[in-house]
Regions:
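Glycine/serine-rich phosphate-binding loop and adjoining beta1-alpha1 elements at the start
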Residues: 2, 8, 79-170, 298-300
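An N-terminal-biased, well-structured beta-alpha scaffold segment characteristic
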Residues: 2-106, 110
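Glycine-rich phosphate/diphosphate-binding loop of Rossmann-like nucleotide-binding domains
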Residues: 6-42, 152-240, 287
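Short glycine-/small-residue-rich Rossmann-like dinucleotide-binding loops
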Residues: 69, 75-76, 95-96, 221, ...
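Residue-level detector of alpha-helix initiation sites
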Residues: 76, 136, 177-178
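Adenosine-phosphate binding glycine-rich loop
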Residues: 118-159, 269, 274-361
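Rossmann-like adenosine-cofactor binding region
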Residues: 209-291
Length: 361
């Protein structure tokens, strides 16, 4: 199979879908890898490293898309790439269709096979291709939230972990999955007072067992969230319904309960966001303010640390890429239920129930 690795062109997206080591593995399995020139540069991987691995360097994205049977990307195709995708071409990337109707319609029209990293699901209901980026995003949400709390950024001027004699910030994490767990551990590790809210009592029991003493757990209800907001400095939105649009857990009216200069970080923004006042931002212009509350809603948070993110992503995606290349997507999805669940669009039809339900299809 011919595998194409185009350069990511979304705003400040510096990751690449495959490392030189990953390319070498695919080539050793009898496949050809074509990489757009400088695609890995911002992640720390040069053209020469890809060439040494056996990959071929192409100059333009048009060349990469034209030659490839399977396109591997990091982020969803953007408008300028729609026309490059052809019928029956396999596109293996994060799509997040539930928050991108225009993208969904474009991919349906293209006739491509869209296999989404975020809905590949194992028998134990874990999402193996979402986990590594969720780990990165969860940790980074605390870094970015802490910066936003600084006075020059428009925040309250609070140090997240406090100092002896001065109380730390209070962090509320909405969602106790991978993102929320990593965010809570990161915040607790630097001394913040953390509350994790989730709708699953078994998950809250588990989190209570593994978290340090400065982390509380709470059943996620509107009433409980409203009670906490007046004393909360930083809220991390980490809610996930696989493939579906995220629910709005904080409405605009609820912002009035918070103190001016408090911060919302919406990690769920790539699935529509879990705050009513959220809209996607970029690394170039990451923060805006609504009713005195700072909103950080960057849709590709891990793109800011591309070296770490690219290695973590390739570790997760490469085994699946090898299966797809060796067997072809149809046989691979017949024999591997987790890959079958990754199928979102095939031959112009939405085949992922969560996406179909979002748009009433």
């Amino acid at each position: 199979m011919k595998i194409g690795i185009p350069k990511e062109i979304k705003n400040n997206e510096s990751r690449v879908a495959l490392t030189p080591g990953g390319a070498k593995t695919l080539i050793q399995n009898g496949h050809e890898v074509y990489v757009e020139t400088h695609a890995g540069e911002n992640s720390g991987f040069s053209n020469e490293q890809y060439i040494k691995s056996g990959a071929k360097i192409l100059v333009t994205p048009e060349e990469v898309f034209a030659i490839a049977d399977m396109i591997m990307k990091v982020k969803e195709p953007i408008k300028s790439e729609y026309k490059l995708i052809r019928r029956n071409q396999l596109v293996f990337t994060y799509f997040h269709f539930a928050s991108e109707k225009e993208l969904m319609l474009a991919m349906m029209e293209s006739g491509a096979v869209c296999l989404a990293y975020e809905t590949v699901e194992k028998a134990d209901h874990t999402l193996p291709l979402l986990i590594p980026m969720s780990e990165v995003a969860g940790r980074m949400s605390i870094q970015e939230g802490a910066r936003c709390l600084e006075k020059p950024k428009g925040g309250k001027g609070i140090l997240l972990g406090g100092v002896p004699g001065v109380k730390p910030a209070h962090v509320l994490v909405l969602g106790g999955g991978i993102v929320g767990t990593q965010a809570a551990l990161m915040a607790a590790g630097i001394g913040a007072h953390v509350t994790i809210a989730d709708i699953s009592l078994p998950r809250l029991r588990y989190l209570s067992e593994i978290m340090p003493a400065n982390v509380d757990t709470l059943m996620s209800t509107t009433s409980n969230i409203e009670d906490l907001l007046p004393q909360t400095d930083l809220v991390i939105g980490a809610v996930l319904i696989p493939g579906a649009k995220a629910p709005h857990l904080i409405t605009r009216d609820m912002l009035k309960l918070m103190q001016p200069g408090s911060v919302l970080v919406d990690v769920a923004i790539d699935q529509g966001g879990c705050f009513e006042t959220s809209h996607p931002t970029t690394h170039a212009d990451p923060v805006y303010t609504v009713d005195g509350i700072l909103h950080y809603c960057v849709a590709n948070i891990p793109g800011a640390v591309p070296f770490t993110s690219t290695l973590a992503l390739t570790n997760a995606t490469l085994p699946y890429a090898v299966i797809l290349a060796n067997m072809g997507w149809e046989q691979a999805c017949i024999k591997h239920e987790d890959l079958k669940k990754g199928l979102n669009i095939v031959n112009g039809k939405v085949v992922c129930k969560a996406v179909a339900d979002t748009f009433g299809l």
